Amino acid sequence: MKVASFICVAFVCSWAALAQDTTVPDERWPRQFDSGGNHFIIYQPQVDRWKNDRLEARSAVMVTQPGQATPAYGIVSLSARTAVDKESRTVALEDVNVVGATFPAAPSRQAYLADLIRKSLPDWPQMISLDRLLADIAITRAVSNGDNIQLKNEPPRIIVVTEPSVLILIDGEPVFRTVEGTSYRRVINTPALLLFEPLSNRFYLDGDRWWMTAASLNGPWSIATAPPADLARVKAELLEGEQQDPHAHIADLAQAPPTKVLVSTSPAELLVLQGQAQYLPIPTTELVYVTNTDRDIFMDVRSQMFYVLLSGRWFQAKSLQGPWSFVPGAKLPRDFSMIPPDSPKGYVLASIPGTEQAREAVIANQIPQTAEVRRSEPRLNVRYDGDPEFRPIEGTPMQYAVNADTDVILAESRYWACRNAIWFVSDAPQGPWEVTDYIPAEIYTIPPTSPVYRVRYVYVYGCTPDFVYFGYTPGYLGAFVSDGVVVFGTGWWYPGWYGDWWYGWPWTWGFGFRFSYWGGGWFWRPIAPYWWYHHTHATARFYYDHWNTHWRPGDREWIHNNVNVYNRWPQNSVRSRSYPTNPVSPVRPPVQAQPRRDLYAGRDGQIYQHRTDGWYQQNRSGVWNKVTPNPQLEQQRQSRSLGQERHDEFKNRGQVPGIPHTVAPRLPSRPVAPAHPPVPARHR
């Protein structure tokens, strides 16, 4: 269990506190610079431990003093506070301390050289690629495997169809509110624009370019060839106060209506096949996959069992029509772990325990996005639908607000609000609110059965009199570690609040979330390009992380753990990036022109060098002798190569070949829909 209880210090030495340059690149390693008349060459840090925002690492160094022809080779052990920016995939090293320094071939000068290292710290490289560190951690296992929490894995209602269909999700039984000045009643607990006209006893569903109609929510639905004349006006008035037009962000919305409309008042997933299932074999396995769908559907030829991957969880059935049951990833047929990474379905390896892809995903899920928040800003205003109403959090002495537009928790006789991964505190539920550097430890005991569970993944990492250092891991956005893999959503359905407003909670099912590697990171995304035609009729409000939601015309919905919610705050109050004020510029030609100088800091305190003909170790006389490396050294070399590859992928437009470059939207977590027109209105 992580507990965010911290002691503030009066001053934190941060190289990047006044940074202005947000384009500092991560240059190739090693780096070199001059300081105090000495020439330093620093090799890529090797991670020993990374927990919360504290990094412990080793770096091989070369120090050439004035008048010395031969450099001194050593190992520097460092600790630093990390400022992570997942959008730029960079890590700034701040408050760096030299824990120790050894120079095996120069023991008589070791103390002196260590002192030179400490004095040169202000000139050291202060930025490193996140992908380099993650690749190193994948080898060293320098972070934990996550909380491995127990989530709910019961299958949703899985609907398989072979014709163009759309799924309308309603948050429980439909709740109706009269549209002011009309005879229409709106179903407010769905993101779809769904109206009921009692005089004609007809339902009307907005399809952007058409209206569909039915006498019952269960259908059958058909095109309204002559919709009521006032429908267009009602729609325009309702959408006028919306945070976004639920259709505007999809430029390639289907030109024809779906054949079938399905309505579900419980969690559901829609699997659309273009006709009867068609299969292709996966090389080196006894598996086949369904090719005429954008879903991940497999069949094990030996057992004739079907498998489908939904929100990172596996379900199995003897028939595509079910019934489906959850199967732990560790109990999948062994052939799943043998799927070639470069096959069309290679990305599912991230959801198979024990694979390298799953380990990388788990590691990435532990790295926090960090921000420096000014205490005097930002401002928080919590909106309640009526008087504040609180309910108990199961298994704890705490309570949470059920009718607020923000996660508000009553703990230790005070009110704690978490919005956009910043914690606030107040003595009253309505405020006034102020940024806090203390979070009650019991908040980190909130169970997954609670709709405010996600706040457990927002932490305070430190503070000064003027700033608080916050961070959150992808759990805040709905990505959790369970049974050795990363899954999306807790699996629980949380009843929403229905008053003048509808306040809903995050959903796990209904959006076809797929976990795949893209542009240097693992990304959740809905798999269908047309969320209306092929998939679920819903705006982004049902997802996690909703504040200031927006879409851009033509974007495909890529949902990823690199979304930086701190960007929702004014830049003068929250700084989510930390960069050195004076980035280091090499004073000599880049060291990468010397490929033989590939140095590694061994855990045994020795310096190793990799050359084209193998590994060498420097003895106490300064002579390099060829050695047989231990497996860890070779793994370090491979991870360094992988880190460079991933770093280059991200630099090349943040794109993996064959996958379209897209823009990630802001992902909502608590859909809000007013039944009457308070401002700003959403669903009226």
Where do the model's predicted regions map?
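Extended intrinsically disordered, low-complexity coil regions enriched in Ser, Thr, Gly, Ala
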Residues: 203-233, 307-337, 419-420, 424-445
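Low-complexity, repeat-rich tail regions
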Residues: 233, 243-263, 291, 326, ...
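Post-signal-peptide, soluble extracytosolic/periplasmic N-terminal scaffold domains
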Residues: 32-33, 47, 51-55, 67-207, ...
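Short, low-complexity cationic-aromatic patches
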Residues: 185-208, 287-315, 398-424, 453, ...
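Conserved Ser/Thr-centered positions that define the repeating blades of beta-propeller domains
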Residues: 197, 213-214, 300, 317, ...
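Early extracytoplasmic/domain-onset interaction patches
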Residues: 24-60
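Bacterial N-terminal signal peptides
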Residues: 6-14
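Boundary at the C-terminal end of the N-terminal hydrophobic targeting segment
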Residues: 17-21
